[in-house]
């Protein structure tokens, strides 16, 4: 576990040893009890050749350490090293470039003075980096028996009505892809952002899953950090576990996200829309993202890499595809109701839209499909020709830009000769470009939890289809009532359509009488056998209700942009991409103005084999649609008070445990199935992926001599170990666009890469593809020069701004003020202070400006700041943009005669 790496003072006592020595010893037996492997331990003390058994037997290796004071020992199966004196795992590293001449005879370690090398960028751009033994991270399924019994069963203490947090943390902790990332790639939990939630979460996971774990821990640091950012969780009142999950995952994503730059050609046939204001019709309301599809900016502009092609017949005749689509469409009324019911989620959340980018494009063809891609704060609306659905093209728009407001390009004159040549003038946002760069962000959170939904609305008059892509992190499913179940179960008929606003039993408007009757009904239901009331609600029923098709007619007609009228329509919804871990939220709570209610209906859910094939889009590339349950969060009590617990399956021994704050108890599968589920975590199931991991694990024992060694991303290896579909090998997280290591990552390159033997690389590459192949690590000289230029630019811009602003503050009565958007200024400030690596785009004052009588004035209540004319000219000469928003203080004209009269009166008064 790389997360436990630290300096061990006993490393100096290790003798010289080779892999061949360890392999030979692994075929032997314990020198005391003659027990053979696996899991024998070899002493690493210099000139000591002792081999003993582990805790699964008599544990002679520990006895040997106590008697001889030989503290370091290596497991001959996993090649992990343990220090008895430090009671922790240690790592034996060596430097790059010092490989022996015979690649098949390599020392397992070359000890460094401080355990981990401190990086400085050398002048010859040769990267010296410790090499972590690959065996530390590719022991896929080999674990010691003592670890199987102990790890991951640590409770969490309640620190004041925090059972909601404890249950959520335990549920996440038992999601192997996320937990293994923090345990195996802990060095990547780096952030300069406060309150550094990822570091607190890393510390918590280390405590929960450490071999020497305590009975329970107190998650104080993590909780304090979340309360600092989100005031919803301050105080000691009971909160919602689902809200906490969303907040935590959003924070982790923000701190761990990495930007991926993509360059696209701008087809000249696509024209940018001038404004989005003209499109605020009823269809815009229809496409508002529901709470269940609360997208993060984690995978912004993912449409660039995700195909959602549909052939012409399927797209144009969507309404006729009844047999396969009758239960795979979502009710748009439920979308709006979702937002209303869960409005509380958005009130306490963070500013999640700072990475959102609005893009719009039009193809002026007769038959087009409107594609609307949702982000947190903006919608992506594109008209795509039916024949081009397989390759959607997106173009930046000037959303919200008033065409009457001018945005000036950078001034051509060199107003600031002192600026270095790195201050290249940027192009105006409105100027045409041949190529553009999309800002796309990814993190371990988006890799694991993000999926994509396709919503389609078809006009029944002109057959025009509007397609909406939404990125979801969880699915919020309604719990259907008895009448809704009957409709769902009878929907096999092609024309059977679930009415808008279904699941009325759960979400119909309630008054005080209905509220009282609901409680009476629940009491009666609890006293009468379930067979008396009808069929049991299953998770498949909830999914079918969520994806049910909806007929848009009457008061709920569809505003067709082609017909320019309200028309009858039909809406469908399917999943384009399933996430590796599917988070399902059952909507048990309904919040009204004066009171809240809870739906206590039992929902039956499978522990294994959840089949989501009926809800998958036809053209989806997803191959695995079967899920197994990992954990479930349960709520006991009413809407106003109650208690949260979690049932989790331990990934090491496949047993189920109940996590009730600091109490951890083993339970049966029937106990889990009878639970009142609130949030469920399902993981993709793939026997083929498990076989592939076992095959690669077996190859480690072959030890074929090779002349080349390959470097591979730790993050991708974590995917290979824990994902059902890891995807192509991606080494871009430690490489720049030039193929070298970025200078800023040189200091911790050992946390990013591992060295693979050639036979392992060949097998992985032939199976998954991707790359690029890397045999040599070096610091990129080009990036180093660019980084130095950027740093010099930051320093120069900051110094000039401070000087100009100081002069502006000393002015008594400036004649003019220039207003600047604080949103843009904050981005610029983050850049010059080194918090953001990329400079901001052109100055964008469109949100603070308004045009009246042909003059550009400041919008009332706008988020703006005031700077001097010199400061404006300085920033505008570098970044361009606009428009200019100028404030001129009113000038008071004083009558000279009145002034003389006042002076005369003052003189006479003094004389008296």
UniProtKB/Swiss-Prot annotation:
Binding residues for Zn(2+) 1: 8, 10, 83, 86
Modified-residue entries (Phosphoserine), positions: 346, 408
Residues the entry annotates as binding Zn(2+) 2: 30, 33, 53, 60
EC number in record: 3.4.19.12
Binding site for Zn(2+) 3: 43, 48, 64, 70
Alphabetical list of SUPFAM superfamilies matching this protein: Cysteine proteinases, DUSP-like, RING/U-box
The entry's keywords: Cytoplasm, Cytoskeleton, Endocytosis, Hydrolase, Metal-binding, Phosphoprotein, Protease, Repeat, Thiol protease, Ubl conjugation, Ubl conjugation pathway, Zinc, Zinc-finger
Subcellular localization(s) per the UniProt record: Cytoplasm, Perinuclear region; Cytoplasm, Cytoskeleton, Microtubule organizing center, Centrosome
Catalytic-site annotation from UniProt: 163, 643
Modification comment: Ubiquitinated via a VHL-dependent pathway for proteasomal degradation.
Biased composition (Basic residues): 422-433
Domain USP positions: 154-685
Catalytic activity: Thiol-dependent hydrolysis of ester, thioester, amide, peptide and isopeptide bonds formed by the C-terminal Gly of ubiquitin (a 76-residue protein attached to proteins as an intracellular targeting signal)
Class in the EC hierarchy, top level: hydrolase
UniProt xrefs under InterPro entries: DUSP-like_sf, Papain-like_cys_pep_sf, Pept_C19_DUSP, Peptidase_C19_UCH, Ub_carboxyl-term_hydrolase, USP_CS, USP_dom, Znf_RING/FYVE/PHD
Cross-referenced Pfam families: DUSP (PF06337), UCH (PF00443), zf-UBP (PF02148)
GO cellular component: centrosome; perinuclear region of cytoplasm
Written domain comment of the UniProt record: The UBP-type zinc finger binds 3 zinc ions. However, it does not bind ubiquitin, probably because the conserved Arg in position 55 is replaced by a Glu residue.
Subunit structure: Interacts with VHL, leading to its ubiquitination and subsequent degradation. Interacts with ARRB1 and ARRB2. Interacts with ADRB2. Interacts with DIO2. Interacts with ROBO1. Interacts with SELENBP1; in a selenium-dependent manner. Interacts with CCP110.
Family recorded in the similarity comment: Belongs to the peptidase C19 family. USP20/USP33 subfamily.
Record's protein name: Ubiquitin carboxyl-terminal hydrolase 33
């Amino acid at each position: 576990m790389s997360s436990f790496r630290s300096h061990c003072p006993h490393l100096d006592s290790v003798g010289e040893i080779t892999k061949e020595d360890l392999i030979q010893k692994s075929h032997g037996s314990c020198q005391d009890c003659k027990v053979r492997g696996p899991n024998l331990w070899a002493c690493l003390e210099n000139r000591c050749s002792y081999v003993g058994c582990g805790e699964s037997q008599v544990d002679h290796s520990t006895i040997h350490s106590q008697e001889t004071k030989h503290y370091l020992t290596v497991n001959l199966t996993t090649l992990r090293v343990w220090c008895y004196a430090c009671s922790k795992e240690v790592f034996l590293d060596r430097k790059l470039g010092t490989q022996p001449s015979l690649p098949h005879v390599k020392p397992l370690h070359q000890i460094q003075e401080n355990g981990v090398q401190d990086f400085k960028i050398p002048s010859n751009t040769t990267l010296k980096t410790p090499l972590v033994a690959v065996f530390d991270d590719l022991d896929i399924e080999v674990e010691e028996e003592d670890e199987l019994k102990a790890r991951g069963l640590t409770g969490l203490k309640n620190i004041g009505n925090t059972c909601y947090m404890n249950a959520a943390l335990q549920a996440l902790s038992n999601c192997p892809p996320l937990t293994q990332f923090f345990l195996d790639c802990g060095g990547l939990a780096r952030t300069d952002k406060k309150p550094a939630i990822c570091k607190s979460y890393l510390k918590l996971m280390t405590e929960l899953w450490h071999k020497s774990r305590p009975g329970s821990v107190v998650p104080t640091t993590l909780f304090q950090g979340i309360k600092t950012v989100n005031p919803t969780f301050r105080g000691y009142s009971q909160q919602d576990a689902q809200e906490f999950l969303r907040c935590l995952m959003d924070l982790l994503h923000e701190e761990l996200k990495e930007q991926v730059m993509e360059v696209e050609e701008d087809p000249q046939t696509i024209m940018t829309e001038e404004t989005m204001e003209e499109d605020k019709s009823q269809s815009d309301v229809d496409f508002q993202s529901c709470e269940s599809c609360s997208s993060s900016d984690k995978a912004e502009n993912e449409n660039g890499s995700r195909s959602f092609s549909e052939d012409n017949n399927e797209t144009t005749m969507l309404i006729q595809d009844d047999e396969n689509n009758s239960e795979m469409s979502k009710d748009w009324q439920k979308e709006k109701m979702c937002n209303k019911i869960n409005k509380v989620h958005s009130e306490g959340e963070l500013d999640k839209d700072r990475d959102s980018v609005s893009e719009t494009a039009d193809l002026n063809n007769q038959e087009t499909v409107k594609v609307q891609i949702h982000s947190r704060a903006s919608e992506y609306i594109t008209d795509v020709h039916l024949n081009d659905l397989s390759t959607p093209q997106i173009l930046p728009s000037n959303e919200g830009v008033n065409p009457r407001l001018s945005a000036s390009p950078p001034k051509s004159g060199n107003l600031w000769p002192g600026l270095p040549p790195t201050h290249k003038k940027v192009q105006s946002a409105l100027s045409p470009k041949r190529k553009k760069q999309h800002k796309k962000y990814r993190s371990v959170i988006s890799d694991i939890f993000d999926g994509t939904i396709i919503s389609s609305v078809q006009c029944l008059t002109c057959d025009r289809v509007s397609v909406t892509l939404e990125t979801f992190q969880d699915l919020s499913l309604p719990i259907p009532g008895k009448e809704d179940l009957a409709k769902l179960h009878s929907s096999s008929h092609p024309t059977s359509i679930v009415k808008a606003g279904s699941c009325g039993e759960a979400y119909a408007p309630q008054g005080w009488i209905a509220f009282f009757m609901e409680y009476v009904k629940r009491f009666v239901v609890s006293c009468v056998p379930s067979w008396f009331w009808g069929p049991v609600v299953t998770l498949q029923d909830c999914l079918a209700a969520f994806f049910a098709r909806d007929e848009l007619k009457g008061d709920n007609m569809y505003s067709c942009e082609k017909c320019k009228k309200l028309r009858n329509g039909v809406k469908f919804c399917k999943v384009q991409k399933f996430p590796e871990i599917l988070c399902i939220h059952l909507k048990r709570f309904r919040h009204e103005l004066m009171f809240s209610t809870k739906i206590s209906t039992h929902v039956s859910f499978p522990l294994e084999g959840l089949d989501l094939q009926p809800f998958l889009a036809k053209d989806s590339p997803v191959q695995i649609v079967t899920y197994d349950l990992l954990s479930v969060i349960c709520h006991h009590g009413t809407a106003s008070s109650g208690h949260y617990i979690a049932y989790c399956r331990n990934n090491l021994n496949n047993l189920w445990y109940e996590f009730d704050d600091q109490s951890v108890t083993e339970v049966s599968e029937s106990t889990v199935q009878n639970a009142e589920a609130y949030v469920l975590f399902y993981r993709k199931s793939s026997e083929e992926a498990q076989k592939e991991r076992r095959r690669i694990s077996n190859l480690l024992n072959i030890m074929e001599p090779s002349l080349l060694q390959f470097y591979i991303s730790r993050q991708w290896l974590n995917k290979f170990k824990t994902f059902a579909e890891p995807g192509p090998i991606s080494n871009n997280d430690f490489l720049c666009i030039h193929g070298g290591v970025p200078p800023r990552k040189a200091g911790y390159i050992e946390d990013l890469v591992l060295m693979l033997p050639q036979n392992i690389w060949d097998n992985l590459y032939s199976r998954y593809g991707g790359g690029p192949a890397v045999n040599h690590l070096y610091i990129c000289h080009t990036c180093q020069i660019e980084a130095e230029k950027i740093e010099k630019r930051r320093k120069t811009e900051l110094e000039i701004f401070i000087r100009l602003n100081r002069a502006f503050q000393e002015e008594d009565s400036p004649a003019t003020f220039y207003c600047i958007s604080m949103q843009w200024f904050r981005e610029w400030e983050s850049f010059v202070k080194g918090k953001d690596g990329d400079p901001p785009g052109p100055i964008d004052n469109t949100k603070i400006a308004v045009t009246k009588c042909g003059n550009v004035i400041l919008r009332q209540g706008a988020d703006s700041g005031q700077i001097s004319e010199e400061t404006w000219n300085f920033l505008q000469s570098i970044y361009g943009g606009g428009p200019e928003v100028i404030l001129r203080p009113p000038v008071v004209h004083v009558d000279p005669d009145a002034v003389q009269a006042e002076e005369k009166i003052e003189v006479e008064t003094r004389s008296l």
